Design a protein with these regions (language model features):
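Short, Lys/Arg-rich N-terminal segment immediately upstream of the first membrane anchor
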Residues: 1, 64-65, 237-241
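Hydrophobic core of alpha-helical transmembrane segments in multi-pass integral membrane proteins
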Residues: 6-14, 45-52, 78-90, 216-232, ...
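Juxtamembrane helix-loop-helix connectors linking adjacent transmembrane helices
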Residues: 22-37, 58-129, 136-141, 256-264
């Protein structure tokens, strides 16, 4: 079910974006409409499809009841990831020549509220519900925890359709997936993702040279290795059915095809 829903979202991603542009008059010229369009797109692409994948359960997820320390760690990891990737992304853009999209900034208090909802809160909630709650947990029982983590991470990054942001999407997706697998609750990746997005908004004018990429990278790598060690025991790789394998290949190749215009 998770793969079928993901395939449907991959096929509808571009038509939904086009439809929203036709529905809302010139969202690029008005910050309020721009944020409303982003919220609507997030809800249609990720929020509603995530409901089709309920309940978000897997036999391989061990639910941890402690929440305060875990939430604090999620805040730290999400914020540090954004800071590290702010230093890495310009190097990646220079290497690949990828174009970076501009985010429209708010001009008043009401627009700031809409901006926080559109850029921080809503994406964290609906994307984590879809990718970690639905896709990751759905794949865990069919192919094992570690392969499910790696594939859901790749699909998350590809489905965002941004070559410039590809390394950053890979990094936060991997860490959110590890958080879900090690703690068993959607709250952990949601908090991590929300802090990652929030740091991007708050630090948007901070020079990349100010970001200590190397020490932050060491910290994040150590955290990722520690979480990986916890999930390795959850089961070996289980071979997918032929139909599921074909569907997964179509999803990955179809999502990757969105990058062709930037690469040629």
């Amino acid at each position: 079910m998770a793969l079928m829903v993901t395939l449907g979202v991959m096929l509808l991603r571009l038509p939904v974006g086009w439809g929203i542009q036709q529905l809302l008059p010139n969202p690029q010229g008005d910050p309020a409409l721009y944020y409303a369009a982003l919220i609507l797109q997030e809800m249609l692409l990720w929020g509603l499809p995530a409901l089709l994948m309920l309940p978000f359960r897997s036999r391989r997820l061990v639910v941890q009841r402690k929440w305060l320390g875990v939430s604090t760690a999620a805040v730290f990891i999400g914020t540090m990831t954004q800071m590290a990737m702010m230093a890495v992304t310009p190097l990646w853009v220079e290497l690949t020549g990828a174009g970076q999209g501009e985010i429209m900034l708010p001009r008043n208090e009401i627009q700031w509220v809409l901006a926080v909802l559109a850029l921080v809160v809503v994406p964290a909630l609906v994307e984590e519900a879809f990718f970690r709650g639905g896709l990751l947990t759905g794949l865990c029982d069919t192919m094992g925890a570690l392969p499910a983590l790696l594939l859901s991470t790749l699909v998350f990054a590809l489905m965002h359709g941004s070559l410039a942001g590809f390394p950053a999407h890979l990094a936060i997706s991997l860490l959110c997936g590890l958080g879900m697998l090690t703690r068993g609750r959607l709250r952990v990746p949601v908090v991590m993702h929300m802090c990652y997005n929030g740091a991007a908004l708050l630090l948007r004018n901070t020079p990349a040279s100010w970001m200590p990429a190397l020490p932050l990278g060491v910290i994040l790598t150590a955290a990722a290795m520690w979480m990986c060690a916890q999930i390795l025991w959850r089961g070996r790789y289980r071979q997918l059915k032929a139909a599921d394998t074909a569907m997964l290949c179509v999803i990955v190749l179809g999502a990757a095809a969105m990058y062709i215009p930037e690469l040629i």
